[in-house]
């Protein structure tokens, strides 16, 4: 396929910035300026990798050979809010935190439970970001995206099979999403944001280098005393804590003392340390409870 690349910025041997602050480099890193250039990237390399905020991502020390696309240009980070209709539209590279804050300031409620989740809009939709206070699918109207041929598509909320930390969007690359929100008092909404954020700061190591939750919360296949009942989803952090893993460290990475499902990196840490700690924690939890933990963090490896 002949693809016009004249105006597309592509770096060679470029760093991949993640919240962990570890890992290898991208052989090629593209910075599309808009959706059309993002479509060009897909036509160049359908199996490319999308880099949003780098929060829920671990890149192996060897880096990746596929084209990595960074959603860091202004046109891909725009947010439009219409208080009269109660609608908000955000582009794929928009900060989830900025979206939540702007909606509250405009007197539109419904997304406050997402405060404190580090993500761009696209990644948040694909992972159905959320927690105890709600998930992003709750207020979604529709998703705009590009298929792996670079063609534009729009999918309504009722056609998307959302679940726990998944969207069912498959290979679709999200370019924007629209939300329907409820009118509310801006002062009350901002106070709700402060309360939720204060709780997260008390219970999570938000000031340290971490990707957020490393593991998904598992559903138990049997009742475990003091943990949970069969067929119920339980906290992976609780299992890790009860397995005696808080403070466990390998190399420059340790299990947080504040929240056991968070791994914290220190200067000099490597992605290999994180991967080794993931294996060690999974082994301890399985040995203690017979529960197989699945990773929530996305791992990029060279093929």
Predicted feature descriptions by range:
Residues 30, 69, 90, 143-145, ...:
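Preference for bulky hydrophobic residues occupying beta-strand positions
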Residues 90, 99, 104, 126-133, ...:
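Core subunits and conserved enzymes of cellular information-processing
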Residues 2-129:
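Anion-binding (especially nucleotide phosphate/pyrophosphate-binding) glycine-rich loop
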Residues 57, 100-103, 111-115, 128-135, ...:
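A generic local secondary-structure boundary/capping motif
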Residues 10, 57, 146-276, 283, ...:
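Phosphate/pyrophosphate- and phosphate-bearing ligand-binding catalytic cores of soluble enzymes
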Residues 74-75, 137-141:
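A short, compositionally biased
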């Amino acid at each position: 396929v002949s693809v016009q690349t004249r105006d597309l910025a592509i770096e060679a041997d470029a760093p991949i910035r993640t919240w962990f602050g570890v890992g290898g480099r991208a052989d090629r890193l593209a910075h599309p300026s808009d959706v059309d250039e993002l479509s060009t990237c897909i036509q160049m390399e359908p199996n490319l990798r999308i880099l949003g905020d780098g929060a829920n991502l671990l890149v192996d020390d060897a880096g990746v050979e596929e084209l990595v696309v960074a959603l860091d240009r202004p046109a891909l980070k725009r947010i439009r809010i219409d208080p009269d209709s109660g609608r908000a539209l955000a582009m794929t590279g928009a900060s989830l935190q900025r979206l939540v804050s702007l909606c509250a300031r405009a007197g539109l409620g419904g997304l406050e439970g997402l405060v404190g989740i580090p993500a761009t809009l696209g990644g948040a939709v694909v992972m159905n970001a959320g927690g105890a206070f709600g998930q992003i699918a709750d207020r979604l109207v529709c998703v705009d995206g590009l298929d792996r041929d670079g063609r534009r598509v729009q999918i309504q909320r009722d056609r998307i099979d959302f679940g726990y930390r998944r969207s069912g969007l498959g290979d679709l690359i999200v370019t924007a999403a629209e939300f329907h929100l409820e009118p509310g008092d801006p002062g009350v909404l901002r106070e709700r944001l402060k309360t939720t954020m204060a709780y997260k700061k008390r219970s999570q190591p938000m000031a340290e280098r971490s990707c957020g939750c490393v593991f998904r919360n598992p559903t138990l296949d049997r009742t475990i005393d003091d943990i949970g009942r069969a067929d119920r989803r339980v906290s992976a952090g609780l299992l890790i804590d009860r397995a005696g893993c808080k403070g466990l460290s390998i190399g420059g990475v340790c299990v947080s003392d504040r929240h056991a499902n968070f791994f914290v990196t220190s200067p000099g840490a490597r992605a290999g340390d994180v991967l080794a700690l993931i294996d060690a924690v999974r082994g301890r939890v399985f040995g203690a409870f017979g529960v197989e933990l699945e990773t929530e963090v996305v791992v990029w490896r060279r093929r």
